[in-house]
Amino acid sequence: MFAKTFKAAAILSAVAFAAPALAQGHVVIVEQFGANNSVGGGQTGSRQRLVVVQDGHSNVAVATQDGRRNNAAIGQVGSNNLADTHQSGRRNTVGVAQIGHNNTAVTTQTGRNNTTAIVQQTNGASASVSQSGSNNTVAIVQN
């Protein structure tokens, strides 16, 4: 259990801080090691950052960001996981780590300075978060 928790924390930390800051541009970093993984989405506005690491197979990551300085970090180590994140506004941050298989995480954030963290270290878990406004924080851990 500790090893899984440590691995999830390491993935979130690594992907959240791995992207370099650019003066006016967007940053997208994608690493996929297994077969049949896919990433989609888009970024509008300025200084958006997206980092995705998918180690297993048949994982899907979707991230859309609109506004300024939004950050999304998705790490999926298992297989058949879905992470679907949508952010609009300023300085919103979402981090998703799915270590097991067949997990789903869906997040929507609008406003400013909102933070969502989802860690799912099991199989077949589902989490959905919707935040609107400013300075909201949600953390979900499912073992």
Which ranges hold each PLM region?
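Bacterial N-terminal signal peptides
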Residues: 9-16
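N-terminal signal peptide c-region/cleavage motif recognized by signal peptidases
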Residues: 18-20
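Bacterial N-terminal signal peptides that target proteins for export
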Residues: 1-9
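Low-complexity repeat regions of mature extracellularly deployed or surface/particle-associated proteins
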Residues: 24-143
